From Swiss-Prot:
EC number(s) from the headed UniProt entry: 5.3.1.14
Cofactor section: Mn(2+)
Protein name: L-rhamnose isomerase
Role noted for this protein: Catalyzes the interconversion of L-rhamnose and L-rhamnulose.
Length: 419
């Protein structure tokens, strides 16, 4: 430990103690909050089923920065590099298209064995795994419908894919001793004015009921469902809207996924957390950064990221909210994107843990909104960075921007050699 870091740490402890905050306790609490990193930042959502195929489903990864992962071994190596630069507990979020098999596997036939390498790798790296069926980038999703498809056979294919995915998810949880959160998102919708908005939603409702009909151990697997406002090519109508999934999660008591980019640009998911928690047992968060639309830019340490973290901490939702990330920027170094976004999420959680929430609640309850605002603003200037640097030190990760040197070295040695 450097003398400078130690001095800053001691001063920070004193400053926070003066407002009633135990920084050691804050760091212990931070270690209770894993962040689930998404594997698809590493290869622009290509996967291993058909890596040269087009990305569909109304989503886009823009940019052509060199060095993207082309295989499972490359993706895992890149992930290890990123993980080594991020302090504290982490998980990995996989999509079904990241299966490994020597022969082609139909999506409705995926099995735990196709993800065995991921499980062994997760064990070696002390990670939990989360999962997602991949209802996009496939010939049977080409017309924009999957679980809500009017064709019985196509709809059944996607139902079977999601059912198979649940068994993979349960396998993750059983093998790793921590439940896998499996999120169902489908791109189903229409580009232009839609006359019958009810029938597709009725089909989606019935399909989802069939998907979750198999009873699985909740210690191994958690179901989540995710809404969206619109996607490219589905601007006018999305079957799985916010109202649809809020009703579904409430009535079926599944987890509800809130994606920061899946709402109108004037809406924020931080304001939805406390409302949804009154009705659903769990929330899954996809923390992202929408720029004018669901662009999935790298997460910043901005007001909304901080507000999301503060909602989790202020209401003690540690055991009911699962924090995941969802962004994919192909215009910058992909490992750096992981590191920047994940570290920012963790910084926001730390800052929330360093807030004198009890004092602020008292001021609010007494109607002293002047003092509430004053303290909230003064809080921003307290030396949280020194606490963050100590946290990084204890987890053997770079405290400041030194991590970029490691990324550049890896880029020169490994990424630059990829065609």
């Amino acid at each position: 430990m450097t003398t400078q870091l130690e001095q800053a740490w001691e001063l920070a402890k004193q400053r926070f103690a003066a407002v009633g905050i135990d920084v050691e306790e804050a760091l212990r609490q931070l270690d209770r909050l894993p962040v689930s990193m998404h594997c698809w930042q590493g290869d622009d959502v290509a996967g291993f089923e058909n890596p040269e195929g087009s990305l569909t489903g109304g989503i886009q990864a823009t940019g052509n920065y060199p060095g993207k992962a082309r295989s499972a071994s490359e993706l895992r190596a890149d992930l290890e590099q990123a993980l080594s630069l991020i302090p504290g507990p982490k998980r990995l979020n996989l999509h079904a298209i990241y299966l490994e098999s020597d022969t082609p596997v139909s999506r409705d036939q995926i099995k735990p064995e196709h993800f065995k390498n991921w499980v062994e790798w997760a064990k070696a790296n002390q990670l939990g795994l989360d999962f997602n069926p991949s209802c996009f980038s496939h010939p049977l999703s080409a017309d924009g419908f999957t679980l809500a498809h009017a064709d019985d056979n196509i709809r059944q294919f996607w139902i079977d894919h999601c059912k198979a995915s649940r068994r993979v998810s349960a396998y993750f949880g059983e093998q790793l001793g921590t439940p896998s959160v499996m999120n169902i998102w489908v791109p189903d919708g229409m580009k232009d004015i839609t006359v019958d908005r009810l029938a597709p939603r009725q089909r989606l409702l019935e399909a989802l009921d069939e998907v979750i009909s198999e009873k699985l151990n909740p210690a191994h697997h958690i179901d989540a469902v995710e809404s969206k406002l619109f996607g490219i090519g589905a601007e006018s109508y999305t079957v799985g809207s916010n109202e649809f999934y809020m009703g579904y999660a409430t009535s079926r008591q599944t987890a509800l996924c809130l994606d920061a980019g899946h709402f109108h640009p004037t809406e924020v998911i931080s304001d939805k957390i406390s409302a949804a928690m009154l009705y659903v047992p769990r929330l899954l968060l996809h923390v992202s950064r929408p720029v004018r639309w669901d662009s999935d830019h790298v997460v910043l340490l901005d007001d909304e990221t901080q507000a999301i973290a503060s909602e989790i901490v202020r209401h003690n939702l540690f055991d009911r909210v699962h924090i995941g990330l969802d962004f994919f920027d192909a215009s910058i170094n992909r490992i750096a994107a992981w590191v920047i976004g994940t570290r920012n999420m963790k910084k926001a959680l730390l800052r929330a843990l360093l807030e004198p929430t009890g004092q602020l609640r008292q001021l609010e309850a007494s109607g002293d909104y002047t003092a509430r605002l004053a303290l909230l603003e003064e809080q921003k200037s307290l030396p949280w960075q020194a606490v963050w640097e100590m946290y990084c030190q204890r987890h053997d990760t770079p405290a400041g921007s030194q991590w970029l040197e490691s990324v550049r070295a890896y880029e020169k040695e490994i990424l630059s050699k990829r065609s």
